[in-house]
Amino acid sequence: MQNLLFCDLETYSDIPINCGTHRYAENAEILLFAYAYNHAPVKVWDVTQDKTMPADLKAYLDDSEILTVWHNGGMFDTVILKRVLNIDLPLSRVHDTLVQALAHGLPGALGLLCDIFNVNSDKAKDKEGKALISLLCKPRPKNSKIQRATALTHAEEWQRFKDYAGSDILAMREIYQHLPNWNMNVHETELWQLDQKINRRGMCMDVELAKSALTAVENEQKRLSTVTQQLTDNAVQNATQRDALLQHIASAFGITLPDMQASTLQRRINDPDIPPALRELLSVRLQSCTTSTSKYKALLKSVSADGRLRGTKQFCGASRTGRWAGRVFQPDNLPRPTLDPNTIDNGIEALKAGCAELICDDIMQLTSSALRGCIIAPPGKKLVISDLSNIEGRMLAWLAGENWKVNAFSEFDNGKGDDLYKLAYARAFNLLPEDVTKEQRQIGKVMELGLGYGGGVAAFLTFALAYGLDLDELAEAALPNIPPGVKREAMRWYQKSVETDKTYGLSEKIFVTCDSLKRMWRNAHPQTVSFWYDIEDAVKQAIQSPGIAFKCRKLSVRRDKSWLRICLPSGRSLCYPSARIENGQITYMGTNPYSRKWERLKTYGGKSCLAKGTLVLTITGWMPIEIVSQDAYVWDGIEWVRTDGSVFNGNQEVIQAYGVGMTADHQVLTEKGWKSASQSKRYNRSSCRLPDGYKLPRFRRKEINLESTLHLWTRNNHSSNRITKTKKTRYNCLLRMPKGTNNIMQKPKARNVKTPRFCCMEQHVSQMYSPFPQSMVKLWWSGNNGLQTLAKKFQQFLGRHGQDIPTRLIFRSHQQQCRLPPQKLPLGYVASTSSKYSTSTIRANSPRHNEYTGISSPNRDCSKHALLSPGKKGKSSTTSGAPKHIAEVYDLINCGPRNRFVIATPDGPLIVHNCENICQAAARDVLAYNMPPIEKAGYEIVLTVHDEIISEAPDTPQFSAEGLSKLLSFNSDWAWDLPLSANGFETYRYRKE
């Protein structure tokens, strides 16, 4: 039996921990060393009182047969131990429970793990421990009389601090016994040890460039501010002042811009008819909002004294997929350069010389493009870089069993196969690849790139424009060859798209052509389309039959006690604790990515999706989710992050949540944390900051068909039984709409009507007109919310439809408030005189009465936001009140470290969660399998970015990009038939090839 030594350090440093462990360690001191041998009592060595290490601790650390167990020991404790005490524990003797937890889809925080495994943990003590760490492990505030708290200045707190250190050992020891070890096999353990070597090695950084770039940005911002003032006659002080700039452009040039998005500005700049002064002003605005100063600042504060940046990747940091997550510098989210490599190289030299303005017109663009160039090769070495080619596309075809495509990849790699783009067209049109013309190949290229992740017409349109494909010529060339049946289906979809205003401005001919090509591409990939549904079926079977493995092509799914495991071909598993089926939905326990609470989640199997047409905020502006491409940058509410693009998840049942169609289990960020879309009616969306220069798009107001009897009730605003009627008495009236439930309720006293409407209804305007001229009345608003009038006025206003309206109060969760939109509002459309919905009364002195007075709004600009709100304590929040329906649904893959992105809703920007991807996990295993051989061959890995390896190697011909690519694309025994290819280059400064 393995002997264990459980260890934990408490440290002090005047360098903040957010600068990274290695920078923190340069000034670190060890305060306490807590330890326990196997199940022996915990001991605490107070290093501040006695510098001599206890004899038993020294013996344990010197014994090579004893395994030391730490929580975050790899990335923190052992680094400090080596730096401060010069004790270099071999990584083979280090076990990290944090990494073990992450590898199995569990949170890394020790406190959360205690909650999950029901380990006895005193919450009050844990809270006190954090306060003690803040007091004793960090410098005191500058205005404090005591600059550092110690055992001498805070003796009582110090003793409690020692007790707290011992309690962490007890918790860690219990957690170690509970954690599964499926994913900590020999290969994964060796891979983690290599990961620690890479993190400790770090990468050489051009600190001079980072400092020069920050200086250049600061100077350029001042210059742009001066230019803005000159161009606007001091009406606008800085081009980053969006509202002031929009107002000035409208007044000075008579041009109203819908927003300040980069795509909007670029279109205007390219317009030859705009005045030169406006063109210059818009260019200044673009430059002012393009920079990456935060990355440069993170680099400078975290780089070690020797010029290397360390500790930038967390092993298994990406939940469940096992991919690495960025830390400190976040190298996975470096902006894609917009300048060519030669321009960047010259610009870097100019930045370092302090004269970038002499060769570059846009300093901000240069500094953003030069950010990757901060990673350099040290003297005598070069950077050798290689990237797996289209690994996720290959992996998807291989996992799904799309054999014809797997063979096509393999033959193409061997130089024997047909061009993949010709093959894509030929496969769709049932032609021979050699018969595909140059023009048809271009169509095939757009099909492969635009539809590879399930994109539709909009994706096809985006890639067609990107590759200069003339859509009229496309329609002329392709339409005659499209089978009639496919064409008929495309025509039906076009007619539906016209009704929903989602034709993207395309003519019928072009739309039908693009949609037909989409259908033909999907018909050519039947295994890929069915793959996700087969996985879901296997998961449901496994949950219902514990201990039995269910095969799903190259995957297997099984339930071991409370754990659901999707076993990848590599032998690693994607782990889902406490998986079960609830109302047909697959659920499991997981960490809420926002609140960090452990709770039941409903995201699995491609079901968490958004309806086609949902607008996603990308760095180029708002874009329908189906056309978001691989390597695009999306806003996650905090920063721009890279995504692997959208994935089509079939036709699924969607509901309306916050005015957007999505599956009921899709995760949305509310004021109370992450909730499923089906719960959205009970919560307001979380506030979300949009990046400077980006504005919520305008939503077209449509008529609202309520599809059921409308109940119109009135109530008065008072706080007692006795109502004193005075001239100041105000009455509020709400339009109430029952939510579709199955409750059997009494017949309401409201007449059924066939879509009567309030016409010309506008908020903040005193008049509105009924469908009946003789009943036109004036209505007044109660402040910014509600309708101020009496029941009789509403009866008169509604003419013959309002005679049976009672005047009592109702409150029920099944009813919905309806804030009146600025255009037409249909009151109802029913098919029968009976109703499913009941009413109930509430006394005027109800303590809950005032909670529902008026119609509250989180946004004063009522004319821009038509909402259906739930009436929970009077708060406004668009709900899932609309009936369910079937729609094409999509999700985004791998959206940065927070796994989320921002979409547009009528209520404002909304943060949603992105889907997990089995292909990512399997692709990660390909990269991981080949990392140890690459390291052994002399290519010292300094960084991995998605499917790319950056290594340092001697500057000799022996080490080449071809050699590295060959090692990276080597097939493992578990993926011997997976076609792999890698390409790379050699450089002295990192760049995007």
Swiss-Prot record:
Keywords: DNA replication, DNA-directed DNA polymerase, Hydrolase, Nucleotidyltransferase, Transferase, Viral DNA replication. InterPro entries: DNA-dir_DNA_pol_A_palm_dom, DNA/RNA_pol_sf, DNA_polymerase_A, Hint_dom_sf, Intein_C, Intein_N, RNaseH-like_sf. Its EC number is 2.7.7.7, 3.1.11.-. The keyword Signal does not apply. GO terms for biological process: DNA-templated DNA replication; double-strand break repair; intein-mediated protein splicing; viral DNA genome replication. It catalyses: DNA(n) + a 2'-deoxyribonucleoside 5'-triphosphate = DNA(n+1) + diphosphate. One of its GO terms (molecular function) is hydrolase activity. It comes from the Viruses. It holds the Pfam family DNA_pol_A. The keyword Hydrolase applies. Belongs to the DNA polymerase type-A family. Replicates viral genomic DNA. This polymerase possesses two enzymatic activities: DNA synthesis (polymerase) and an exonucleolytic activity that degrades single-stranded DNA in the 3'-5' direction. This is Probable DNA polymerase. It comes from Acyrthosiphon pisum secondary endosymbiont phage 1 (Bacteriophage APSE-1).
